[in-house]
């Protein structure tokens, strides 16, 4: 696809549908009750908007572009996993290209980004009848697709995920 610009490596969470029945305010303490799985994922991204300045906190956490696909890696049962300061990287051995990152680039840590999204869902009174994913933002940034092949993303202590770009 000629509009595909790059890929991002992210932490994603599977949230239980019980979250929508929760009538109290979501917080860091009760947030963990609604997370069933955690996984590394690759987001294949396309067109990006150019934002001029930041007008709100949401601008820092919002993705202003067209996402083409999410590839979710192996899910791990969530057991209060610490993803605050984990090294990450995306590599393509075919073209000898590696980009290094860290999970702390996302709103200090991915759990903060998750909390922000869930608070917004609660505030807007969104309802849904099944479990759902929340993708918490890039730990590596948009890595340009410089060639075809398999791009492998690794988040230390969490796992790896691969996407074939052809």
Q: Which residues make up each language-model segment?
A:
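Conserved metal-binding segment of the jelly-roll/cupin
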Residues: 128-146
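Juxtamembrane/interface motifs at transmembrane-helix termini
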Residues: 120, 150-151
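Short, flexible, glycine/charge-rich loop motifs used to bind or transfer phosphoryl groups or to couple energy/partner
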Residues: 2, 124, 141
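Extended mid-to-C-terminal alpha-helical interaction segments
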Residues: 89, 121-125, 130
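Preference for short coil/turn "hinge" residues that link or interrupt alpha-helices
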Residues: 65, 121, 136-138
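Short, structured beta-strand/loop micro-motifs enriched in basic residues and often containing a Trp
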Residues: 111-119, 132-135
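Catalytic-core "active-site belt" of small-molecule-metabolizing enzymes
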Residues: 1-109, 114-115, 147-150, 158-166
């Amino acid at each position: 696809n000629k509009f595909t610009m790059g890929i991002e490596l992210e932490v994603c969470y599977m949230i239980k549908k019980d979250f929508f029945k929760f009538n109290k305010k979501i917080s860091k303490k009760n947030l963990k009750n609604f997370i069933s799985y955690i996984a590394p994922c690759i987001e294949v991204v396309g067109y990006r908007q150019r934002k001029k300045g930041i007008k709100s906190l949401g601008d820092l956490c919002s993705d202003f572009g067209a996402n083409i696909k999410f590839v979710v890696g192996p899910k791990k049962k969530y057991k209060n996993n610490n993803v605050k300061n984990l090294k990450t990287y995306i590599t393509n051995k075919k073209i000898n290209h590696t980009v290094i990152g860290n999970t702390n680039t996302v709103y200090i840590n991915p759990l903060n980004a998750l909390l922000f999204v869930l608070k917004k869902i609660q505030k807007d009174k969104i309802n849904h009848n099944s479990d759902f994913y929340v993708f918490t933002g890039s730990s590596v940034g948009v890595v340009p697709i410089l060639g075809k092949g398999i791009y492998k993303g690794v988040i230390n202590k969490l796992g790896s995920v691969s996407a074939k770009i052809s």
